[in-house]
Amino acid sequence: SSSTASQTSTPSTSVSATGTQSDSPEVQAEAAVVAFWAMRDQLASDPKQGVTKLSDVARDQALDVHRRSLNAQAAQGWKQVGMTSVTPQSATATDKPGEYVVKACINVSKVNIVDSEGKSQVPPGRPAQSSYAYKVQRDGEKWFVVQDLLEAKPC
């Protein structure tokens, strides 16, 4: 029918957790870090889900290090309560096409890690927020966090 043809010819913008195609690459790269932390929070809050979904938002070193961390928490019967707040600070292109370094302030002041009895396992003196640099890469229309060296700096 003609209505089908007109629907397929209408340009549409895909909206996802990693921004929209019309956003600048910098905005999309920053959104990838936000999406990564949202997924990590979800998996840490419900360890029964396993860590498979982390590969929807992360690859390479970042996937490995966070998968290990989540599995270690789950193995001890720990889970996360509360959500991480992520405030992107900057996105800078590297010399590799489609790759950015995103600096973001990660606020964990509302996050607790508890054991099976509900007792907090957060070390005393944990900073409420720290800035981290993430390497993010674009693959087609999707963005992935590929490197997190876990080097905390003040926000």
Indicate residue ranges for each PLM-predicted region.
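Solvent-exposed loop/turn segments at secondary-structure junctions
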Residues: Q61, V108-V111, A152
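Short low-complexity stretches enriched in small and charged residues
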Residues: S9-T13, T20, T52-D64, S90-A93, ...
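Core segments of small alpha/beta cavity-forming domains
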Residues: V15-Q80
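Short beta-strand edge/turn micro-motifs at domain boundaries
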Residues: V101, Q121-C155
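Primarily hydrophobic membrane-targeting regions of prokaryotic envelope proteins
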Residues: E30-A44, V102-C105, A133-R138, E151
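Surface-exposed, charged secondary-structure patches
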Residues: Q76-S116
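Amphipathic, hydrophobic N-terminal targeting peptides for secretion and organelle import
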Residues: S1-T18, L150
